[in-house]
Amino acid sequence: MSAILASLRHPLIQAPMAFAHDTALPLAVCRAGALGSLAAAMYGPPALEQALQTMWDEGGGLPYNLNFFAHRTPEADEAQRAAWLAVLRPYFDELGLSEGDIPANGGRRPFDADALALLERFRPPVVSFHFGLPAPDLLSRVKAAGCEVWASATTVEEALWLEANGADVVIAQGWEAGGHRGWFLNRNPACQSGLFALLPAVCQAVNLPVVAAGGIADADAVRAALDLGAAAVQAGTAFLLADEALTKPAHRAAIRSARPEDTAVTNLFSGGAARGIVNRFMREAGPMNESALPFPLAGAAAGALKAEAERRGCFDFSPFWAGQGAGRCIPGSAADIVARLCARL
């Protein structure tokens, strides 16, 4: 059993969500008796150091989760880049942008030596990974720092791989989940399962605690996941409506009105498959486009579109990440959301 899971007052984890929160949300979740998560993929070393110092100073010793992406940054040749820019050129022209407006990188950092050095200094109780696990030499140092290692699996095969390669807890991510798919072995959407098919299969396959993730938006879903064998549940979209989240008003409004069919898995915003609320960009260019550069390279040009459109008050190119349970989410403080999700425990 995970010592961290056993220590929680509520078997609930706030999912890490890059851009959607700073330290205020995970701190509030921790104080409410659940496990708050800090998404580190968007932080450079100085900003991550400051965030970890805040978690240390204000966390009161409560456990929290520090999340990283474990991807390996790929290469793209000129032909691939030209094909992706051809998809985006009509939108660039519409907004008066040129290739010179594209930043040098996609903004999503893989776990690296700089992050490891900060982790060894601050020793977060839980370190979780998306897209598999980091290289064995890095992972061994994470474990040597005393951190529990959690990681996402979207299939039974991935769960077994994580168990064999050093994970302490498996997060079973159903197809309903908002944000990026954590897949790393089989990226075929046709092979992905909903949570309530995936969860019992993973629980049966591995000898590790399993956290259920995907479409968890109310107390009934929490209760059902625990009844199917989950040691805890992870909710993301529900916490996008928290008072402490950084979610934009337009994103909040879209979540409140979303039906399950209003979300889709798209690769347009980063090159990685991720579920969000369908917008103009997704309808016209996707939601999946074979010309999108591999994760995270597509995010540089897509991010330029987003930034300029939002500057004009337009959200046609904004990734409003949300799971299929979005419409069942209710706004409130993080403590209110924790209490609401755990009302049937």
Describe each model-derived feature in a short phrase.
Residues 180-185, 189-211, 216-345:
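Conserved active-site-proximal phosphate/metal-binding subdomains
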Residues 1-205:
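Active-site entrance/lid segments in N-terminal catalytic domains of soluble metabolic enzymes
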